[in-house]
Amino acid sequence: MNMCILGTIATGVETLRTRVEYNMERGASKYCSEWKLADTGNNGFVWLGNITDMEGMGAFLTTDEEMKWDKDNGCVYKLYTMSEMSE
């Protein structure tokens, strides 16, 4: 996993899970080979993904449709990139 999204969503984490599944079906899977979504309570979430094309995923997440969906659902988050630590 090389991307972490930490945030909250007013409409609930299951709403976000449904949206992520929808987005994967409509093309985000071209940029993300694996993902996990964890409910941290109080409408908080952590999303982890293995992004294979950062530019493509960035473009996908910043479309007018995605930005409107975030606003309509009260989804506020920060994105972080990660790298694996080895011994």
Give residue ranges: language-model regions.
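Short S/T/G/P-rich N-terminal loop/turn motif that feeds into the first structured element of a domain
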Residues: 1-69, 73-87
